[in-house]
Curated annotation (Swiss-Prot):
Function field: Toxic component of a type II toxin-antitoxin (TA) system. An endoribonuclease that cleaves both E.coli and M.smegmatis 23S rRNA between G2661 and A2662 in the sarcin-ricin loop (SRL, E.coli 23S rRNA numbering). The SRL sequence is highly conserved and is implicated in GTP hydrolysis by EF-Tu and EF-G. Acts on purified ribosomes but not on isolated RNA in E.coli, nor on a shortened artificial substrate. Upon expression in E.coli inhibits cell growth, colony formation and translation.
SUPFAM superfamilies: PIN domain-like
Notes on how activity is controlled: Inhibited by EDTA.
InterPro entries with a match to the protein in the record: PIN-like_dom_sf (IPR029060), PIN_dom (IPR002716), VapC20-like (IPR039018), VapC_family (IPR022907)
Protein name from the UniProt record: 23S rRNA-specific endonuclease VapC20
Lineage: Bacteria, Bacillati, Actinomycetota, Actinomycetes, Mycobacteriales
Native source species: Mycobacterium tuberculosis (strain ATCC 25618 / H37Rv)
Length: 131
């Protein structure tokens, strides 16, 4: 299983993004099912709506209905784990959404992510790149 971060969804949904081609190649070679979270989808909506407009955000929101994307809902317990993790890690400016993603990944035993911002690697996960 691969976890998908906002940085990947934003690159995939924005043809003007410098990593759009890389995102398309990764998506073409993805496993049968990937995972993301409701927090990541919310962040993706905001990012694409601001950068690319409403139509791009609506297209990205359709991800939640896809049969190849499993959306994990972040529980109060996972949010608390994220807050506790953030308090312990001041070596980088991690976002709360990333910290909730890390909590989901630890809960599900996921090590690999489609992510482009370096935060997942810095947190000990593997940011997958095309071969």
């Amino acid at each position: 299983m691969i976890f998908v971060d906002t940085s990947f969804w934003a690159a995939l949904g924005n043809a003007g993004d410098a990593r759009h081609g890389t995102a398309k190649r990764l998506w073409a070679s993805k496993p049968p099912v990937v995972m993301t979270s409701n927090h990541v989808l919310g962040e993706t909506w905001t990012l694409l709506n601001r950068r690319c407009g409403h139509r791009a955000a609506v297209a990205a929101a359709a991800i939640r209905l896809s049969t190849v994307v499993r959306v994990e809902h972040v529980t109060a317990d996972l949010e608390e784990q994220a807050w506790e993790w953030l308090v312990r890690h001041d070596e980088r400016e991690y976002s709360f959404v990333d910290a909730t993603s890390f909590a989901v990944m630890r809960k599900k035993g996921i090590q690999n992510a489609y992510a482009f911002d370096g935060d997942f690697s810095a947190a000990g996960f593997v940011e997958v790149r095309p071969e």
